[in-house]
Amino acid sequence: MWEGEHAGAALVAHEKGLRVYYQAPTREDDLSSQLGIIERALDRGCNGIILSPVEALPFRTTIRRAIDSGVPTVIVGTDLGIPPGKKLAYVLNNEEAGGELAARRVARILGGKGTIAIVGISSQLTSTATRARSLETVLAKEFPDIHVTDRRLGLPTVPQEQQVAEELVSKDDHVNAIVALSEASTRGAYYALVEFNRIGEIKLIGFDQDLLEPVRSGGIDSVILQNTYEMGRRAMGIMDEQLRGKSPAPQVSLEPLLLTRDNIDSSQVRQMLTLVWWYDQ
């Protein structure tokens, strides 16, 4: 879970009197540890699972086991490719809308003409593939003078993504802008721009919840935010209904928000990013 997601889930759990055990790997890309956490929870007879999976495909068998065992399960942020049903629900970000926001923003800052690179396209996460497809569809239809000259697959760590971005920004014939489709690729691209003194020269649009100061200072043009607090709140609300034998909506889709220097201090952004923590001892 993201911190915002945890906060939203904790608030609803407090209101509903649910006891929550929060567990996560020490590294964001530690797939085997996350799988192990879920397997152990099932072995111990947990009453429900809320999961933000590192990847989609490796979790299908484990989540099917949970469903077959009658354990209510809510998946947050990633579509596993298993249809929602009585014991399985999804709370997702509208990734197509995120790609559209990125496309229109890059078109605006480039004046409708230029070259861009897309980094962070992961074959393991459908979210980044959807963002990339939506981004390129909008550019092709509405901004034909903006050309995608480089596409790079996503890597799991920030240092790896930084190395990818450094290959792009170190070129003399570098692109006008980079669109980074994940948190790791956004951070890696930003660090590469700092390292090669290309801040401002190459525009960066990313997907990240925490890089606020670089947006405020102009180091990053903009980031697309997911409403992680609301995702956590909705996920725990669905879990509560499932545990009480009700039939909640099987899938919820939440809209992203484009964060720029112009709206970073707005009430809408503050509401999305402010964490209200409740601890049920």
Question: What do the predicted segments below correspond to?
Answer:
Residues 24, 92-93, 117-127, 152-155:
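Short beta-strand->loop
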Residues 19, 57-97, 108, 115, ...:
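Flexible loop/hinge segments that line or gate small-molecule binding clefts
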Residues 127, 138-140, 145, 230-281:
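Hinge/cleft segment of the Venus flytrap/periplasmic-binding protein
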Residues 2, 21-23, 50-52, 73-77, ...:
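Structural recognition of the beta-strand scaffold that forms the well-ordered cores
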Residues 34, 90-116, 130, 160-162, ...:
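Hydrophobic alpha-helical segments within soluble ligand-binding/sensing domains
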